[in-house]
Amino acid sequence: MKNYIKKSIYLIVIATSFAAQAGSFEDFFRAVRGDNASSVRSLLQRGFDPNTRDEHGQTGLLIALREPSPKVIQVLIESPQTNVDLANAKDETPLMLAAIKGQQDLVTQLLKCDAAVNKTGWTPLHYAATSGQLTIMKVLLDNYAFIDAQSPNGTTPLMMAAMYGSSEAVKLLLAEGADTTMKNQLGMTAVDFANKVNRSDTAAMITAAAAARANAPKAIPKDGKW
């Protein structure tokens, strides 16, 4: 009888715990979508994991960026438990999303949280170059973003800037030494990307930069030494 009572109490405690967790799960994501910062903060203080994913695999921070829910973004970024590098199903990190949207202040905050500037596949620099976010591109490069990073199909930031970004974005990448000769899996260079969308001025700019590099005098060592 005693064992039966103990087992019953144990099952009740477990059931109550699961119910509480389910309630917190729903409350958290409802608060995130509604930009209810106080509710999110309260849940975190009670031990809710900010890195929990919803039924679609999205974290609270990713959802807050999408909505957007700016107050909740601040709460989550300020939480030491938040992993700012967790990506969505498309392998997009919070830094990538902030970069393509031109959210400079958020990019700065994420970098202060040690958000990864470089990663396998598409990178924040690809995204910033795509939308011509010059200031963010400079910040990423200053934080050692790999300028010739390749996406899964071999596309570089210069290629994305050539097709979708601004001429200033292309100019910046060229000035910083982006490789003009690289090709993606289809054998296309940055010039090909520009020509594909009839951006002849951009194609000419890249071609001129490549020619200038090819004709640049080679460094000569002094007295036989570098």
Located regions from the model:
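Ankyrin repeat structural motif
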Residues: N36-L44, S69-E78, Q103-L111, Q133-L141, ...
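Intrinsically disordered, low-complexity regulatory segments in ankyrin-centric signaling systems
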Residues: K2-I5, A20-F48, E55-Q58, A211-W226
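Ankyrin-repeat inter-repeat connecting loop/turn
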Residues: P50, V84, D114-V117, I147, ...
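Bacterial N-terminal signal peptides
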Residues: I9-S17
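Ankyrin repeat A-helix N-terminal signature
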Residues: R30-D35, I63-S69, L97-Q103, Y127-Q133, ...
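Ankyrin repeat boundary/linker residues
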Residues: D54, N88, N118-G121, S151, ...
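Ankyrin-repeat-protein effector appendages
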Residues: Q21-F28, C113, N143, E176, ...
